[in-house]
Amino acid sequence: MIDSDTEDRCSHDSSHTGTEGGNSTQARGETGEKALLPPPLFKHRDLTRIPKSAPRIEKRKLTNIINHLNFTDGYLWVHLRDPRYEEDIFVHAYPQPCTGEAITCRWSQENLTGFEYHRFLNLVIDDGMAVTLIPVKLLHINREGFTIQMPDAGHVLGKREARRYACQGVTAELTQSGFLARGTLLDFSSLSFRVRVAPALEGSFHWLNPDEPATLTLYQGQKIVFSDPCRFIDQTSSMSVKEIVLAPQKTKFHRFRGREIRSPRVNLAPSSSVTFVHPLVGKDIQRDIIDISVSGLSVLENMDECVLIPGMIIHHLTIRYSGALKLSCTAQVVYRRKEKKGGFRCGLAILDMDASTYGKLSNILGNVLDPHLHISDEIDTEALWKFFFETDFINSKKYALLESHKDKFKELYRNLYRNSPELSTHVTYQRNGNIYGHVSMMRAYHRAWMVHHLAAKPMPGNTSHTGLKVLHQLLNYFDGFTHLPSAKMDYAMFYFRPENRFPNFFFGGFVRDMHNPEICSLDLFAYKNYGVKSSQNPLPDKWSLKEFSAADSYSLEQFYRNHSKGLLLRALDLGSKPSGDSELKEVYKKHGFKRQWKMFSLTHAQELKAVLIVDQSDIGLNLSELLNGIKIIVTDPHGLPWDILTSAIDQLTSVYEVDSIPLLVYPHTYLENSNVSYEKQYYMWIIDIQYAAKFLDYMKKKTTIKLRYALKFFFKRFLKK
């Protein structure tokens, strides 16, 4: 429509016209019932005087404009003059099909009738960007509509800085320091919004200060599509229902924590684009992608078709690649910047995306950066077995455990690597089907993912460190993955042996540099291979083994807080209200896998002595079986004899289908002080994903430094087990 309460006040458009009383499309009272409205009073009569410099629109083009309005069920405005008071008014009318000789329009049912005695001045078409004036020569009029002679030409009065779009079905809430008003969004441009709102119960517009910013929240259904502070541009004078024009305060903001080193952005070839249904206008939108990374993308909008506003959330956006592949996600506009060559560059952050789709996007981008990189795509498992044996990742001891289950093991990995993106992802470095580097990551606990199976070997003719390339790409994968709610990742964990210099330099180095175990922690465990016994010794009097409960959590947390202050309890969900394994168990079961765990408390005279976490998984899911054994946290190392602990362990091993299982015992000194032998030690490295940006920046700095002695010094011990 043409009114005085639009974003044109912000842009000072000289072609702007106005009406009093707000939008004539307002056809519902506070009760929500349909009502006929009086025509709005037109105040700026001089604005319809056509200047000599106004561009002309010829009859043929006018005919096409009229027919397009009819095709889209659009409307135009009729500029009338009341003969009694010489006042100009505007009313809605809907154009009918036009042959080029005459224009016939039907009155809007929202308007009062009785315009037969008014003087017809102009037809006005507002396409959101410009106002077109059509001179009128009346041929016929009645209570249903009218017909005018098609003029030789119309005129364009002016052009707005930003196109305005009418909106329907978008709920608006305006808040300011306790004041609340609710209503609807009438229209918007890339510069501003126009809303019609009324105060909530017991509120008053007297409380609304237009000199201070207010927060505008827009809903499409139950979903928020915009919520940000805005400044006031204009408002109507009514104190019951107001039309208010608001301009967003921000042209850019950071959705995620800042990074020193961003993930690489690439230009995709063949070309790619995004498509979505605009959340405010409900129309299909397509934009070409300028560049893209795993965490976001940017597009270019022309001056006269800008529809992206910083802060706007698009819940169903599709990335189209090469005309065939479609990747769906939720995205948010985070900046809008004018380009020197014209148009506006808009950045969008990816807020959420399912794991399978994220893997496809990562693989596309990884291949652009390095054609040897493969991320979460189908893998030749025969090449994978060969790689694991060649790199000594499956050594003689591990193979002895796997040999009797090798057929199951092969099928397990085919399924895991091809059909289970919710649970696992992998990065490989390949050439001609041969694998030279590998790392994978799997969802090990309710909100914790475990990095494992990190191995590499030199690629013939390539002097760069393959392991560093794989690790670097895993970090790029992490960069976007950690932001996705659907990933269910609050913590990432990684086991490595203290003598393994490669991870100790990178992962352990970060812990030492941070010096804050609530950001990233290292806990040292003793590893012991424990034989499963068929017979069980009962616990002595006053000793008890029972399922872990909230009553035991205080003693556990107190012990761990005074020994480590790290993240172990949070990552393994050993807090006061453990959520358990039921959700993750079902996800694994859906994909044909086993994954579950239970926690038990070993007490003496009601005093906690140890917590035992019974982990179960398919054999070989982790090649070191770190998810198919028992973790033990000894809370009273001096008050727990080894023979008592073994009696408790023996009561829990009946769930395993193997002859022996790994024990991981914390603190690592317990076995040594109890004169019990063990094979090795493992660090459990854990990071709180809230601080993933710090780790990614640290690691990318480390992996981009050309270490002269990296190959010579680290590679020999790359994954010593």
Regions found by a protein language model. Give the residues of each.
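Glycine-rich acyl-CoA binding loop
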Residues: 451, 460-479, 641-646
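Extended hydrophobic-aromatic, low-complexity segments
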Residues: 205, 309, 526, 568, ...
